[in-house]
């Protein structure tokens, strides 16, 4: 049986080249605003890495920093960016500080600039089958699966995780691909019973080594969207070493879903730019 470790960086680079080419054809740089509140160091690193990725394809990006006490200023800036014709995409760097009104963020962000699809409006459109945007990580996961060439129709897909930004959307997207979908979560009894039935297994629970090799069947396609830091190293939710020789396709962490998610931020920013051009 064919076995392959999926190279997310290679897939990401192809997407970036496509985005860069389209931007050059437009002859105008899209602009992305990233709003971040609080002093979480990892969030700062993620935000700055997004800026670098944007610059590599010709997108202008700026990070707006706010202290955890500047909630009013945060929302004032968000509303101004909503109306700014020169700002095409807006991202909110999560998590926001405790006490921030996250529901207000979901209600306030301009849906046509909401490149990570966090607004209530965009989530509704996604589940109605008429999305303006698809959340970046679920979009990356589906792109990776399509890139394998595996026919998803009729496959049993198991998703571990039910967050609004990852688990639920990716389950919906897999349904759209005509998979039979099972969603597992922290209250699921006998997780291994479900994972052993999966033709496609998407792990997005945020718990290191949640899935081991003895919990999957031979030939499974495993997409690991987990990010866990342990003793200074990054790990996924699946025990890669015990799974890599059993899976037909598997994403490593790091180097799997992460780079493709970053590329999808760029792609969605380009889509937001196109919406703005159409409205002129």
UniProtKB/Swiss-Prot annotation:
Molecular function (Gene Ontology), one example: methylenetetrahydrofolate dehydrogenase (NADP+) activity
Family as reported in the entry's similarity comment: Belongs to the tetrahydrofolate dehydrogenase/cyclohydrolase family.
Pfam families in the cross-refs: THF_DHG_CYH, THF_DHG_CYH_C
Catalytic activity: (6R)-5,10-methylene-5,6,7,8-tetrahydrofolate + NADP(+) = (6R)-5,10-methenyltetrahydrofolate + NADPH; (6R)-5,10-methenyltetrahydrofolate + H2O = (6R)-10-formyltetrahydrofolate + H(+)
Presence of keyword Amino-acid biosynthesis: yes
Subunit structure, as described in the record: Homodimer.
Record function comment: Catalyzes the oxidation of 5,10-methylenetetrahydrofolate to 5,10-methenyltetrahydrofolate and then the hydrolysis of 5,10-methenyltetrahydrofolate to 10-formyltetrahydrofolate.
EC assignment: 1.5.1.5, 3.5.4.9
A GO cellular component annotation in the UniProt record: cytosol
Keyword Heme: no
Pathway in which the depicted protein is active: One-carbon metabolism; tetrahydrofolate interconversion
Name the UniProt record assigns to this protein: Bifunctional protein FolD
């Amino acid at each position: 049986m064919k076995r392959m470790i999926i190279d997310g960086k290679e897939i990401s680079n192809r997407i970036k080249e496509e985005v860069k080419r389209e931007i050059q054809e437009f002859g105008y740089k899209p602009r992305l605003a990233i709003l971040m509140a609080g002093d979480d160091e990892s969030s700062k690193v993620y935000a700055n890495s997004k800026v670098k990725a944007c610059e590599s394809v010709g997108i202008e990006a700026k990070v707006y920093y706010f202290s955890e006490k500047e909630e009013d200023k945060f929302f004032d800036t968000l509303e101004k960016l909503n109306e700014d014709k020169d700002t095409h995409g807006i991202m909110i760097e999560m998590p926001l500080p405790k006490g921030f009104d996250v529901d207000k963020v979901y209600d306030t962000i301009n849906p046509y600039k909401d490149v990570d699809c966090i607004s209530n409006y965009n989530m509704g459109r996604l589940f109605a089958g008429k999305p303006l945007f698809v959340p970046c990580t679920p979009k990356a996961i589906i792109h990776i699966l399509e890139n394998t060439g595996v026919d998803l129709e009729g496959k049993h897909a198991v998703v571990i995780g039910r967050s609004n930004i990852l688990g639920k959307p990716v389950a919906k997207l897999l349904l759209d691909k005509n998979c039979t979908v099972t969603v597992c979560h922290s209250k699921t009894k006998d997780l291994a019973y479900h994972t052993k039935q999966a033709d496609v297994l998407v792990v997005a629970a945020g718990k290191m080594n949640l899935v081991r090799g003895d919990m999957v069947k031979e030939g499974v396609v495993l997409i690991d969207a987990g990010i866990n830091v342990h003793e200074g190293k990054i790990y996924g939710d699946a025990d890669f070493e015990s799974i890599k020789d059993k899976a037909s396709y598997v994403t490593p962490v790091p180097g799997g879903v992460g780079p493709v998610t970053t590329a999808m931020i760029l792609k969605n920013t380009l889509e937001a730019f196109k919406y703005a051009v159409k409205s002129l």
